[in-house]
């Protein structure tokens, strides 16, 4: 099948979802050669991946992942307006690849959102385009990445947050590692990670490195059964909601996909420069993350609050971003967000 698919894609013909499933099953089962894999993903990138193609690839990757078993729905009995359909596990994983060298915003957000009563299955990896990926900064903060599947499940179920280290859970990806490294370009594999959470997170805030991926990946999430989520891209290039410019947002709901531009001023947040959000290596970013969780004021805190606000909306914890902003600030200022980090460090090192 992969030979036929290569020939078709080279002629700039789109594959159906079913065809893509067949090809990716060959790739992830070790039936395709390295040369075939490289040719296919290069041709696909040159043509441009469609919603159907990305959906098919993600379905195969989800099928072959090592699954993390956690409770399906999380209810907060202190609330008056419990929404069973939306209160599910949240992921804040982005594609990476923005090349803006900011600190680890979505990783910091994960602790804040989990402190608000949302169970977070933070999916991530080591650095792709920056000096520090989510795995790198968590390791520097003291989180042990070399843990069992059972420990990850305990983290999510008992403390409300766990880190899902992609290389340890996506074993079928090993067949594509060599070809990807050798061709050295971004391919469909750069966007599959956030679409294939091993815990089956039903709600997401997904940052992407290209604006044209925003609406496309929102429709993919919809196809894959996402209950509610946001796909975002900062006009400054960030794969996060940003404070330096407007952010393109595609919201996924049961009703469909709606896209718009968001301005920081809508939530009363001040704009800043990119230098205000810069990070460094793992050690430097660990210091930044800890300072934000300890309550240090400034643009770094504000961008965390902004992204956390939308995460809380996605998880059904609040009805709008303004309420999410207030809840996120309280989670930091009360010390609960920092406590989540300390609990994760402790449990992963037991």
Curated annotation (Swiss-Prot):
Binding of anthranilate 2, residues: 180
Molecular function, one GO term: anthranilate phosphoribosyltransferase activity
Gene Ontology cellular-component annotations: cytosol
Residues annotated as binding 5-phospho-alpha-D-ribose 1-diphosphate: 94, 97-98, 102, 104-107, 122-130, 134
Residue numbers binding Mg(2+) 1: 106, 240
Keywords assigned: Amino-acid biosynthesis, Aromatic amino acid biosynthesis, Glycosyltransferase, Magnesium, Metal-binding, Transferase, Tryptophan biosynthesis
Amino acids binding Mg(2+) 2: 239-240
EC number assigned by the record: 2.4.2.18
Pathway named in the protein's UniProt entry: Amino-acid biosynthesis; L-tryptophan biosynthesis; L-tryptophan from chorismate: step 2/5
Binding of anthranilate 1, residues: 94, 125
Ribonucleoprotein as UniProt keyword: no
Cofactor(s) needed: Mg(2+)
Any GO BP annotation: L-tryptophan biosynthetic process
Glycosyltransferase recorded as keyword: yes
Free-text cofactor note: Binds 2 magnesium ions per monomer.
InterPro entries for this protein: Anthranilate_Pribosyl_Tfrase (IPR005940), Glycosyl_Trfase_fam3 (IPR000312), Glycosyl_Trfase_fam3_N_dom (IPR017459), Glycosyl_Trfase_fam3_N_dom_sf (IPR036320), Nuc_phospho_transferase (IPR035902)
Reactions that this protein is recorded to catalyse: N-(5-phospho-beta-D-ribosyl)anthranilate + diphosphate = 5-phospho-alpha-D-ribose 1-diphosphate + anthranilate
Function of the molecule: Catalyzes the transfer of the phosphoribosyl group of 5-phosphorylribose-1-pyrophosphate (PRPP) to anthranilate to yield N-(5'-phosphoribosyl)-anthranilate (PRA).
Subunit: Homodimer.
Entry's family note: Belongs to the anthranilate phosphoribosyltransferase family.
Record's protein name: Anthranilate phosphoribosyltransferase
Originating species: Geotalea uraniireducens (strain Rf4)
Species lineage: Bacteria, Pseudomonadati, Thermodesulfobacteriota, Desulfuromonadia, Geobacterales
């Amino acid at each position: 099948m992969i030979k036929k698919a290569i020939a078709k894609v080279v002629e700039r013909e789109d594959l159906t979802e079913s065809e893509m499933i067949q090809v990716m099953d060959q790739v992830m089962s070790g039936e395709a050669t390295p040369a075939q894999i490289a040719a296919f993903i290069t041709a696909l990138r040159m043509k441009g991946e469609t919603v159907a193609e990305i959906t098919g690839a993600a379905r195969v990757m989800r099928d072959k992942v090592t699954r993390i078993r956690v409770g399906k729905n999380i209810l907060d009995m202190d609330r008056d307006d419990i929404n069973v359909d939306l209160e599910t596990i949240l992921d804040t994983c982005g594609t990476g690849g923005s090349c803006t060298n900011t600190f680890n915003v979505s990783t910091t957000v994960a602790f804040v959102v989990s402190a608000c009563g949302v169970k977070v299955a933070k999916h991530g990896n080591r650095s792709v385009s920056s000096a520090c990926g989510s795995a790198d900064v968590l390791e520097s903060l003291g989180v042990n990445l070399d843990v069992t599947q059972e420990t990850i499940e305990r983290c999510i179920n008992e403390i409300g947050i766990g880190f899902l280290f992609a290389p340890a859970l996506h074993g079928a990806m090993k067949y594509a590692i060599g070809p990807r490294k050798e061709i050295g370009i971004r391919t469909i594999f750069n966007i599959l990670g956030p679409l294939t959470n091993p815990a089956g997170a039903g709600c997401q805030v997904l940052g992407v490195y290209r604006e044209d991926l925003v609406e496309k990946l929102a429709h993919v999430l919809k196809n894959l059964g996402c209950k509610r989520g946001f796909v975002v891209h900062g006009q400054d290039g960030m794969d996060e909601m940003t404070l330096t410019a407007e952010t393109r947002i595609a919201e996924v709901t049961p009703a469909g996909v709606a896209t718009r531009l968001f301005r920081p001023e809508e939530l009363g947040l001040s704009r800043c420069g990119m230098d205000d959000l810069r990070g460094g290596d793992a050690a430097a970013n660990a210091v930044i993350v800890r300072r934000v969780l300890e309550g240090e004021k400034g643009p770094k805190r504000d961008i965390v609050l902004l992204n956390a606000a939308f995460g809380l909306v996605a998880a059904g914890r609040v009805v709008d971003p303004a309420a999410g902003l207030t809840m996120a600030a309280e989670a930091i200022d009360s010390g609960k967000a920092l406590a989540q980090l300390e609990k994760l460090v402790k449990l992963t090192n037991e």
